[in-house]
């Protein structure tokens, strides 16, 4: 019988890329005859352009379909988790009908962490194996399922505690260093639901690898620690699921990088969804200018109230005037800097020999792409689990410096200092050494199969 897998990704490149890469992995290493990937999106044309290099249109074994959503009547003012969960809920009927139409009927179903309600669809359709792909860290999975396992009294004790958050088998950390307590409380219902639904799956795949999160993964394997919280549901590290750089890609940014010295350029990007306020955008511009370092900055129009505003911005912005930047900034930095509107080929930039540092929002895709290319980071978290990611890369892995965003606007002097410390100082050299060692473990993980060979048969 033909082994067919159906994979579903919630909106956003941070979910689409790992799902697509997992699909390729299942075809290449696990004996799948066919994989169909469904991408839920509120903007099909934008999604197609962003994942263009990943599309395998000539391969009938790997099919990508889009599930379009009309969000014109949806309230997009809430937290990102709430917005995305509601979008996935709205897409459930279309997901069900689309999977029902597949021939042959899929025997394996995978959905990312924000689409766990679709596990019930797989159950209704009689699909043999249903799974969740966690597109972020094992630590975030641990946090999600552990918090969902607590009774109400213990949960609020954790939220109000001035002590450490004690997740079994994980390093203790103060709650506010991992999550914004006020935002988490607003997302509590959705987060608890997701944590409860994860353990109804037959297995959980995580976009990480043993050497990156050895202690946390070990705890999931221990029936006395996180294994108990998972109630026997197996957890498999399958990362790094990142899109490889495209050899020979032609782009103006890459041509510019070709002219720069080795590891001399700071790359600045806040992902496909990140946005800064007008004031913060200006401070960042002045900060980059103060460093005197070469830079590539992917810039988007400011957003005053929502740091994830760019995720739902359907305007192209490629030709929009950059009049929100400080007066004269582009002229003063034209010999050392390159400002790019909206989008740049991130994988290729991070893989380029001239790139020496990365100012990032710490979306998990960006973190992994930085690691697999051996680039140290300035961690500047904006939303979702990015605070946890920033804490991990700066505190545990020591491959980044974390900017403190709790005080509001990050001033230009702080930005300049952070960049110089990563690019010029001894601690930056140590971070570069650490991340290049992690890069080797990522390469080893890519050549390994972490799911048992007979698991899907």
Curated annotation (Swiss-Prot):
GO molecular function: UDP-glycosyltransferase activity
Gene3D superfamilies xref list: Glycogen Phosphorylase B
Residues involved in UDP-alpha-D-glucose binding: 272, 343-344, 361-369, 383-386
PROSITE patterns, alphabetized: UDPGT
Pfam families: UDPGT (PF00201)
Keywords: Glycosyltransferase, Transferase
SUPFAM superfamilies: UDP-Glycosyltransferase/glycogen phosphorylase
Enzyme Commission number(s) of this protein: 2.4.1.-
InterPro entries tied to this protein: UDP_glucos_trans, UDP_glycos_trans_CS
Family under the similarity heading: Belongs to the UDP-glycosyltransferase family.
Family matches, as PANTHER family: UDP-GLYCOSYLTRANSFERASE 72E1 (PTHR48046:SF7)
Stated name of the protein: UDP-glycosyltransferase 72C1
The organism of origin for this protein: Arabidopsis thaliana (Mouse-ear cress)
Lineage of the species this protein comes from: Eukaryota, Viridiplantae, Streptophyta, Embryophyta, Tracheophyta
Gene symbol of the encoding locus: UGT72C1
